[in-house]
Amino acid sequence: MNDQVIIFDTTLRDGEQALSASLTVKEKLQIAYALERLGVDVIEAGFPISSPGDFESVQTIAKHIKNSRVCALSRAVAKDIDAAAEALKVADQFRIHTFLATSTIHVQDKLRRSYDDVLEMAVNAVKHARNYTDDVEFSCEDAGRTPIDNLCRMVEAAIDAGASTINIPDTVGYTVPSEFGGIIQTLFNRVPNIDKAIISVHCHDDLGMSVANSIAAVQAGARQIEGTINGIGERAGNCSLEEIAMIIKTRQELLGVSTGIKHEEIHRTSKLVSQLCNMPIQSNKAVVGANAFSHSSGIHQDGMLKNKNTYEIMTPESIGLKNQALNLTSRSGRAAVKSHMDSMGYKEDEYNLDALYADFLKLADRKGQVFDYDLEALMHFSNLREEDDFYKLNYLSVQSGSVMATTSIKMQCGDAEMCEAAVGNGPVDALYQCIYRVTGYEIVLDKFDLTAKGEGEDGLGQADIIANYKGRKYHGTGVSTDIVEASGQALLHVINSIHRADTIAEMKQKKIATV
């Protein structure tokens, strides 16, 4: 049996169905290019009959994508298939994907036909699609709940009609891995012409089983997996293709199969899809979550410093990420703190590790995560406290109109108090202009997030920012019942960290000058 698993991406079709707003044609093409770079074999670009916009998207992608096969979905209806073919005809290589429900509940309650009628519809659809291309995929919708005898009949008939790929969807995410793998195995055992088609699976995540079910299907003989980037899709989503790719790569000795995925493109593709679809990635999501390669436990960090394989079964670099530093939290040990000091170039005789670690724990208990610039400040200034910040916001007033906003502030700058006012595109922008003028710092914001803490009118808002200043990243957080004030606190958190770093740099320079 062929050991190459075909990766079929349906982010632009099934994945887009989960979005509150449709992607533009330009955005879909961006994602299609990313999928092509990733090495996806088949890109399902849309459902042409559903709308003029979808037709245009499929046609545009079909025209521009050269290294992946472009596919379009159609119901088992001649006009749908005709529309798919019309949209796809500009492609170098294309596939028509037609589908029909096969489960008892769908046949009786949705289609309201006999199973023999449904069988005939499927055969006619496949034959009609074959008039346009030899690459025809037929899907048995809700196959996971279809009586096995009926499913075997449908698969055999569709292959006889000319389908080159047979897709077995667990449409409502109902099955468990042993059960779904058993369905695939039964098809291989009982369908006489099964060797004339590739068996594909399309699993949904309603019970959190989509990836496991897909892997079970591969072990039973399936050689195409359908899914989406980041697992986006209707209801609980689809099978996550980045997880599939890394499972097959990481456990290749067990599974005995491979894919054509360029794994180093995974992170880049995942981030693009998240941004364009406005769907944040869960921090603890496998493979691409922000915490996927983070280690905060002291025991884990000690193991990682001795041998990364103790707690990492795959590397950040394998998905296109730079090597991730150990997160410093109150659970981190001395070894992790020393490792960070070493990475910044400090020698052991330049600081007292025990004293630094004691101060580090106090700071970590207050702020959660500690960064390299915090450690450096602790080394020079010992016990850091918020009341020691050079810049503080004493007063804030905001006036917002329909177009622009005006903000007035009073700030403590060491021993002096300064006033400033500014107009901006919204109250936060105006506040930031004030702070930049007072402090003299103007930084580049890489990330700005606002989240609610609690409910109701007295709930807190939290602002989190990541800023770039002279090539170094700084993190800031602010919490207040007023989101504008919280945003200001977050920026001042960053600017005070930068001010301390600049002070340390000056101290180092003076030390060098006196040597």
From Swiss-Prot:
SMART domains referenced in this protein's UniProt entry, alphabetically: LeuA_dimer (SM00917)
Lipoprotein as UniProt keyword: no
Gene3D superfamilies: 1.10.238.260, 3.30.160.270, Aldolase class I (3.20.20.70)
Subcellular location, principal: cytoplasm
Transmembrane segments: none
Start and end residues of each Pyruvate carboxyltransferase domain: 5-267
Keyword Oxidoreductase recorded: no
Enzyme Commission no: 2.3.3.13
UniProt xrefs under InterPro entries: 2-IPM_HCS-like, 2-isopropylmalate_synth_dimer, AIPM/Hcit_synth_CS, Aldolase_TIM, LeuA/HCS_post-cat, LeuA_allosteric_dom_sf, LeuA_bact_synth, PYR_CT
Residue ranges of the region described as Regulatory domain: 392-515
GO molecular function, one term: acetyl-CoA C-acetyltransferase activity
Catalytic activity as recorded in UniProt: 3-methyl-2-oxobutanoate + acetyl-CoA + H2O = (2S)-2-isopropylmalate + CoA + H(+)
Source organism superkingdom: Bacteria
Metabolic or biological pathway: Amino-acid biosynthesis; L-leucine biosynthesis; L-leucine from 3-methyl-2-oxobutanoate: step 1/4
Cofactor(s) named in the record: Mn(2+)
GO BP terms in the entry: L-leucine biosynthetic process
Subcellular location: Cytoplasm
Similarity section: Belongs to the alpha-IPM synthase/homocitrate synthase family. LeuA type 1 subfamily.
Function: Catalyzes the condensation of the acetyl group of acetyl-CoA with 3-methyl-2-oxobutanoate (2-ketoisovalerate) to form 3-carboxy-3-hydroxy-4-methylpentanoate (2-isopropylmalate).
Assembly and oligomerization: Homodimer.
NCBIfam families with a match to the protein in the record: leuA_bact, PRK00915.1-1, PRK00915.1-3
UniProt xrefs under PANTHER family: 2-ISOPROPYLMALATE SYNTHASE 1, CHLOROPLASTIC-RELATED, HOMOCITRATE SYNTHASE-RELATED
Matching HAMAP family: LeuA_type1
The protein's name in its UniProt record: 2-isopropylmalate synthase
